[in-house]
Structures are given as structure tokens and as C-alpha cells.
Amino acid sequence: MLTREIPAVTKNLLIINFIMFIATWVTENMGIDLTGLLGLHFFLAPDFHLYQIFTYMFMHGGLGHIFMNMFMLWMFGPVMEAYWRSRKFFFYYIICGLGAGFCQELAQFGQFYIICNEQVPGFTFADTMMEVRANQGLLNLWTTVGASGALYGILLAYGMYFPNERMFVIPFPFPLKVKWVIAGSIALELFSAIATTNDGVAHLAHLGGMLFGYILIKYWRKHPFMEGNGFGKYGGGWQNTGHKRKSW
């Protein structure tokens, strides 16, 4: 597995993410905050820009963060890119990343509204903009970075197309079917989103990437022209016709 060839899109995504991580570290020592520029800010914050919904997924918050994400991309990206082919894989990856960012923005708006409702007696939805103006500095601190949302979408796709494949997951000493790994991941992210509010992890972004990926796969399956290895006129790809498998 270590010597397998990494397909073009997966390889370029790995390279871009590592380049951006190094650039973030280098420019930080020069007094330039790339995370502040390219990370996804809360949409009511002064530093929010629309392009951040795209750029945030190529930024990471630390060595452990990028290592885990790129390991997931290296593990599952080549399989799905080989099955879908490059154009379709890239489209799916970006949609999951955008969807994750969108869900994170909704989650932050809900969090902001709850905080205001708890601290301001008689707070109503109409008072939101007044509170935004009063808390601009605080809102700028809400910044989301990472490819996790897109990668959770890739993980979901792997589970939907290859549900009975087995993989080792720490701390289990035996391999688990991928469909159970996916179910466990969803349950864990839901629990974490509800039970932990200050752990610094965008759990709802992870779930958002999975949600948008699920919707997209279901759409493709309802439109045979788009399903399987094809993507409209850009179809084609390998297919193991000698092996039958069940999928979700």
C-alpha cells in the first residue's frame, strides 16, 4: 500500500495542503496571518469574505491536524478517485468541503444566538445585528480551518460504495466493516457536537460534509447518467466487473 501510485487529484490535494501549511508557518514568522485571511470566519464577522468558504479547507491549525487529515486523504482518496475518476472525485470533494463550511456557519449562528439570548434579557432575532456590532472583535475569533469536512464526505462515500470492506480502527484489535466505522463516526460526532461545545473541533462541519456527500451520492444514484464511474460526458474509469458487492 505504501508503494501504490497516488492518482492526480489526490496527489495534488496532498501537495496543496502541505504547501499551504508551510506557507502559513513561514508567513506567520513574517507577521502575516494567513489563517486570518483564508480561514473561514463567522459570516457576520468583519473579517469574513465569501472566498473563505473555499480556501478554509486548505488551511490547518497544526502538525497533528494536517497529519491526520492528509492520512485520511491518502487512505481513502485514491480508492474513490479510481472508482469515480478524477473530475467526479474532485467535484465531490469540493462540494463536501463547501457543505461542511456552510453547516459550520449555521452552527456558529445558532451558537451566537443562544449566547445572546442567555446574556441579554428579552433578546429577539431582530436584535442580532445590534449585538453583532457590539461584539465584532469576539466574532472575528471564530475561525474554521481544515479539510476534515471534505474528508468525512470521502469517508462516507467509501462506506457507501464499499460497506463490507474491513479496516483496523484503534483501539479495536480486530478489523471492522467500514459501514460500522461510518455509523460509529456519525454517532461520535453527534455526541461530541451536543456534549462538548469548547473542544475546538468543528463537529457539525464534519457531519455537514457527510450530509452533503450523502445527498450528492443519492442524487447520482437516482440519475444513472451520473452514477457509477461516469460524470456526464466525462465518464470512464476502472470497474471490477468480476466482483459483486452490496452498497448502501
Where do the PLM segments sit?
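A detector for small-residue-rich transmembrane helices and their helix-helix packing motifs
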Residues: 1-248
